[in-house]
C-alpha cells in the first residue's frame, strides 16, 4: 500500500459523506466555530503503570485494528508514526482554524480518539486493562491546546469518542465531552451509553449545553482521586481474570 492510496482511502470517503449531508471540513455557524481533527492512537500515550499479577491478552489479540488495518511500509501501530501522519493532515486546515479563532467566540473541536489519559478510567477498572495503549494521542491534545489556548477558556469544548465511556468534565480549562451511543449489547446491559441519553445538546442559543447527567465516570473522578498504582482489580473486572493469575 502506498501513501497515495492511503490518502485516497482517507479523503476519498468525503465524497460519500457529502452525499449524506455530512460535512467534514471546519465551519462557522453564527458565532460558533466547529473544527474536526484527524488523529490516531499510539502506545506511548499510556503513561500509567501496567497491571501486574494477572495474564492480560496482548494487544494483537484484543484489538482488531492490528489485523483489520493495513498500512504503508514505515507506518506502525506500535510507535508514533501513524499518530504523526494523521496529525500532519491537520496542518491542511490551519487557515480555516485561524479564521475560526479570529471570528468565533465559542469553538468546538472534535475527534474520534481520546486526547488525555485521564479521560479514561484507571486500568484496574477496565475489562481490558491495556485499553489505554490503543485509545489516544498526545499529539491530539497538543493540537487542541494550539486551538483553544494552553490554559483553555470557558468557551472551549472538545468532543471525543472511541472508548464508549460517558464523560463530561473540565480539565485544565477545556470542557471534554463524550456521550456515546455505545454498542447494542452495552445498551442492553445499561453499560456506558444508550439511546435515552441522546441526542445530547452540546451548544444552543449562544452557549454550551448544561453538563450531561448522570455521567458515571467523570462524576466518579470529580470526587475520587486517580490512583493508577493501585493493582487491585475492580469487583466487576476480577472475575474475568481469576483463572489468569501469573505464577
Language model segments and positions:
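Active-site environment of divalent metal-dependent phosphoester hydrolases
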Residues: 1-5, 25-26, 41-46, 114-118, ...
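Core catalytic region of metal-dependent phosphoesterases/phosphodiesterases
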Residues: 1-33, 122-136
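Short, glycine/charged-enriched secondary-structure capping and boundary segments
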Residues: 3-9, 48-51, 123-126, 172-175, ...
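A structural motif corresponding to the C-terminal end of an alpha-helix
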Residues: 15-23, 92-106, 143-158
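Residues at the C-termini of beta-strands that transition into short coil/loop
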Residues: 28, 38, 180
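Divalent metal-coordination and catalytic microenvironments
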Residues: 34, 112, 162, 176
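Active-site-proximal loop/helix segment associated with metal-binding centers of metalloenzymes
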Residues: 35-108, 113-131, 207-247
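Binuclear metal-dependent phosphoesterase catalytic core
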Residues: 131-132, 136-155, 163-247
Amino acid at each position: 500500500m502506498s501513501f497515495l492510496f492511503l490518502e485516497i482511502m482517507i479523503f476519498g470517503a468525503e465524497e460519500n459523506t457529502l452525499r449524506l449531508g455530512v460535512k467534514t471540513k471546519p465551519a462557522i455557524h453564527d458565532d460558533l466555530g466547529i473544527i474536526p481533527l484527524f488523529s490516531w492512537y499510539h502506545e506511548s500515550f499510556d503513561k500509567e503503570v501496567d497491571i501486574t499479577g494477572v495474564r492480560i491478552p496482548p494487544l494483537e489479540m484484543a484489538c482488531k485494528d492490528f489485523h483489520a488495518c493495513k498500512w504503508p511500509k514505515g507506518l506502525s501501530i506500535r510507535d508514533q508514526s501513524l499518530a504523526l501522519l494523521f496529525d500532519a493532515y491537520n496542518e491542511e486546515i490551519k487557515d480555516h482554524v485561524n479564521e475560526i479563532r479570529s471570528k468565533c467566540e465559542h469553538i468546538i473541536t472534535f475527534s474520534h480518539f481520546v486526547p488525555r489519559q485521564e479521560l479514561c478510567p484507571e486500568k484496574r477498572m477496565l475489562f481490558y486493562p491495556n485499553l489505554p495503549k490503543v485509545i489516544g494521542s498526545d499529539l491530539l491534545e497538543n493540537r487542541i491546546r494550539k486551538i483553544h489556548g494552553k490554559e483553555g477558556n470557558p468557551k472551549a469544548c472538545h468532543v471525543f469518542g472511541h472508548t464508549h465511556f460517558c464523560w463530561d468534565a473540565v480539565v485544565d480549562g477545556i470542557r471534554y465531552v463524550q456521550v456515546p451511543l455505545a454498542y447494542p449489547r452495552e445498551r442492553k446491559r445499561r453499560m456506558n451509553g444508550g439511546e435515552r441519553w441522546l441526542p445530547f445538546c452540546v451548544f444552543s442559543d449562544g452557549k454550551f449545553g448544561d453538563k450531561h447527567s448522570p455521567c458515571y465516570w467523570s462524576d466518579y473522578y470529580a470526587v475520587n482521586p486517580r490512583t493508577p498504582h493501585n493493582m487491585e482489580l475492580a469487583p466487576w473486572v476480577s472475575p474475568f481474570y481469576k483463572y489468569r493469575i501469573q505464577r
